[in-house]
């Protein structure tokens, strides 16, 4: 079954997560219209190779045209309009950068796959997530639902008792007024009053019973409000707080957060019970106005009960107003909470009290740094204005599940310029990527005679003015959400807390697993720990400061740990994603470990790792060979950077890599990917067939051009090569190489520079693939 069809069959909570994957950058309508074709394309490869991305993008436009023709035949005007609008948008945004749309689609398909896996795992385990505390959480939720059922039952029981009290009071009131009128007549007639005294005793008994019933109801109401307080505290201080913490974790690459539907059902149920209870308390006031007496419990306790239920409902409504989707720029979906001035960002708020009567009644207003103006001025922080559509009415139509929400899709920030054209205080202690700002959402609720001011805010955001600030800004978001669940601490970086390696390691692994199919292994994390903390045996519990993580240069390097790692993450996502997902890239490995595992392998065995010295991110391969004396040698080629990988895929570099000896014979030193995977098996599928690169020439045309093929070649030194039986198939013939073919000394660490050659084929080969 197609992936899109499988997704349509998921539960509502998963469908809501699916809805959050899509935005204007890649509309869900397009995913729906072209589902089979979209799933048949290799978007990951397109995301790493511009020529293929261009081809796929133009094919996408062609598929849109075909689908438009179908809608035209069906006279489906609405779909025609939507599809035309989508095509115009895609052309305007991605025509010059097709790799961008390829990356977006590849990520969406990957997230869809993860969603299906999560749902399948939950189904196999009876609905429990694959987490050690899943059973405990489920038990807590079951207890919470039982408490909610108990509250609802007690409310209904009170409803019945209120009717009994009302009937009893009506009887008392009728008898009292009847007796009073009869008593007046008897006084006029001078009749015997013995009957009157007997009826008075009956009225006193009725009043006693009425008083007992009233006291019972008042007592039960007090107990019910206490039960509501307990349930509400569990909902807001535990369940909702847990959801908000999981949202923080999801924002920095952790496991996807569960949707809010179940929590919304619980909160709505409690709110309905509270409103019904408030009506019951109002009913007590009506009963009191009809019949009251000395020591009346309603007179004594009703005002307090009214105050308690109103406070409960107000607080519940305020807690139920949440930011469902944190601010995020659509072009950077994997890095929320970082906003660039002048660039649109989106966000979504939701009220977890699903009352139909509130549909289209709540107008949301957005502002930034509402309560921190004085603090911002004191710290010298920048100030911003929110532009775009900064007000919106909440409704139930925009969400798939009918939740009461408002999604802001067209917001931008503009900095308020000071008189000196810069920051308010040039002596500010924080750099701009450490400034934290809050986006606030406000509205007013008028419901059943109550006016409630609602306010919620985003997690702290970092505002940048240049995309080159993104790495440090994202580091700030990681550090903040890793170490605190305080949602409003905008002064966090005036004295940033210290993290432990265990915390940092988990977050670093998330940076890979959230955007690829593979996180970091223990061995890879250990290598990173060495980079941060130096050699050690056990890094668990070791402390890492904010400065060491992001601001201080690594030992012997001119850049920080985070700048180096972030560029590697970018390299993986844009250029070697497919190879990383396959597990072919060992990536982070110390040179000592590299030598240890390769030295026992046969010549031609190689591994792929990231450069430790390239600030911009580089990837290289290291192989084992034997020199003329039979001694094992470990060699590394000079790392390939993004600029080089933009011209040729890493898989094609590996498949075509050669060394050139002094006699100009080309030999491939790469045979087996560690531990023993044949090179062709691992990388062949990621290289485009040469028949596609060079379409056959027209037999009737003029003499065909010679085909060419780009390969990377490392020249070797010429010393001692005469004694070698130079054969491309004999790896034992490989010798110690240098940086050039003029007898230069080998480079330090055995690194080779590679040259890219454009090899002309003979005319005999011109019409046949190599």
From Swiss-Prot:
Modified residues (N-acetylalanine): 2
Highest rank taxon of the organism: Eukaryota
Phosphotyrosine modified-residue sites: 640, 705
Signal sequence interval, chain numbering: none
Residues of the SH2 domain: 580-670
GO MF assignments: CCR5 chemokine receptor binding; chromatin DNA binding; DNA binding; DNA-binding transcription activator activity, RNA polymerase II-specific; DNA-binding transcription factor activity; DNA-binding transcription factor activity, RNA polymerase II-specific; DNA-binding transcription factor binding; identical protein binding
Note: Involved in the gp130-mediated signaling pathway.
Reported function: Signal transducer and transcription activator that mediates cellular responses to interleukins, KITLG/SCF, LEP and other growth factors. Once activated, recruits coactivators, such as NCOA1 or MED1, to the promoter region of the target gene. May mediate cellular responses to activated FGFR1, FGFR2, FGFR3 and FGFR4. Upon activation of IL6ST/gp130 signaling by interleukin-6 (IL6), binds to the IL6-responsive elements identified in the promoters of various acute-phase protein genes. Activated by IL31 through IL31RA.
Protein name: Signal transducer and activator of transcription 3
Gene it is expressed from: Stat3
